[in-house]
Design a protein with these regions (language model features):
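Repeated loop/turn-to-beta-strand initiation elements of outer-membrane beta-barrel proteins
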Residues: 90-93, 146-148, 198-202, 234-237
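Outer-membrane beta-barrel transmembrane domain signature
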Residues: 157-233, 244-247, 274
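Cleavable N-terminal export/targeting peptides
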Residues: 1-34
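Extracellular/periplasm-exposed beta-strand and loop segments of Gram-negative cell-envelope proteins
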Residues: 49-77, 99-132, 159-183, 211-215, ...
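Residues on the lipid-exposed face of transmembrane beta-strands in outer-membrane beta-barrel proteins
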Residues: 41-43, 81-85, 95, 136-140, ...
């Protein structure tokens, strides 16, 4: 009996000693939260709305809807890429990039004023609108465990615009005008990442910016959501969503340029981490 009780007590003590190790092993460890380097490349499938205004030096200008007025497509599949580097246990540095170039041709039913160019009713207007966004961020995870992290970051969305309008009227060329604007928009970011299992994880991020200074004003809101599946040690897959809304206005050489744009759609990518 004593031997039986001794064996039972030894078993209980052994199980109690093994319990913390078992619980520790049960905590999921996903590569997205563990690996120091993370790279991804894939496709972004956004729907977009675009409006812009470029005043002449005399102050004449009108807001133009590039999709409805100038015949640009509302959606286009574009490549995207992102990278992350973890420095220590709590710091992380990220970059994400996409570029969307579009063009359109349409006979307009109203007068279009774009900078110093005027396109009268029934003229054929050819438009080109190129946009790129480079997101840079340095984040600090104030809450960090093996399977969870929540943090804040500072960074910038470097938004670059290149818009050109040209046209003809009754077969005769009217002229063209191009406006280029590149603006690094500083943002405050909030992010989180959670491992569901050793292979599945979810992540979320929100960027926010608002500034009015001298002859510049702008605001930006960006949201990113991701579901990540990594069946291999160094290779995985991701499905997510991106939403970006921005508005900026700047005055230069007596002319005011204003851009307002939204992007929203799914992303699909392959990632490598180590």
């Amino acid at each position: 009996m004593k031997n039986t009780l001794g064996r039972l007590l030894a078993s209980i003590l052994g199980a109690a000693a093994a319990a913390p190790a078992f619980c520790q092993e049960a905590i999921p460890e996903h590569p997205a939260l563990r690996d120091r380097f993370y790279f991804a490349a894939g496709m972004f499938f956004p729907r977009t709305t675009t409006s812009a205004e470029l005043e002449s030096r005399s102050g004449v200008g009108a807001n133009i809807d590039f999709e409805n007025t100038l015949g640009m497509k509302e959606s286009k599949d574009v490549p995207m890429a992102m990278a992350r580097w973890r420095s220590g246990n709590r710091w992380r540095f990220e970059a994400e990039y996409f570029q969307m170039n579009r063009s359109g041709d349409k006979t307009v039913d109203r007068t279009i004023n774009w900078g110093e160019q005027t396109f009268p009713v029934n003229s054929t207007v050819s438009s080109k609108f190129d946009f790129s966004d480079l997101r840079l961020s340095a984040g600090y995870s104030f809450f960090r465990t093996k399977d969870k992290e929540v943090g804040v970051g500072i960074g910038a969305h470097v938004a670059a615009y290149n818009a050109t309008l040209s046209g003809t009227f009754n077969g005769a060329p009217i002229g063209n005008q191009t406006e280029k604007v590149t603006a690094p928009l500083p943002v405050l970011s909030f992010y989180s990442q959670f491992a569901l299992t050793d292979r599945w994880a979810v992540a979320g991020r929100m960027d926010r910016f608002a500034l009015k200074y001298d002859k510049f004003s702008g605001n930006l809101t960006g949201i990113g959501l991701d579901v990540m599946y990594q069946p291999f040690k160094n290779v995985g897959f991701g499905l997510g969503s991106r939403a970006l809304a921005l508005k900026m206005s700047a005055e230069d050489e007596g002319r005011k340029a204003e851009f307002k744009q939204t992007f929203q759609g799914p992303v699909l990518y392959v990632n490598a981490s180590f």
